[in-house]
Amino acid sequence: VSTSRGSQGCFGLKLDRIGAASGLGCWRRIVDS
């Protein structure tokens, strides 16, 4: 599982519309970790 790459991707995607939804999920994973 590429968590590092996913985290960075979430930050960038968070700016996008669809990315915003994905970003939220990523944030939850980061907090859970």
UniProtKB/Swiss-Prot annotation:
Keywords of the record, alphabetical order, are: Disulfide bond, Hypotensive agent, Secreted, Toxin, Vasoactive, Vasodilator
Output the superkingdom of the source species. Answer: Eukaryota
- GO CC field: extracellular region
The GO terms describing molecular function are: hormone activity; toxin activity
Instruction: Give tissue specificity per the record.
Output: Expressed by the venom gland.
What this protein is reported to do is described as: Snake venom natriuretic peptide that shows an increase in perfusion pressure, urinary flow and glomerular filtration rate. Reduces total and proximal tubular transport of sodium. In the aortic ring assay, causes a relaxant effect in endothelium-intact thoracic aortic rings precontracted with phenylephrine in the presence and absence of isatin, a natriuretic receptor antagonist.
Q: Which family does it belong to?
A: Belongs to the natriuretic peptide family.
This protein's name:
Natriuretic peptide NP2
Task: Say which species the protein is native to.
Answer: Crotalus durissus cascavella (Northeastern Brazilian rattlesnake)
Per the UniProt record, the lineage of the source organism begins with: Eukaryota, Metazoa, Chordata, Craniata, Vertebrata
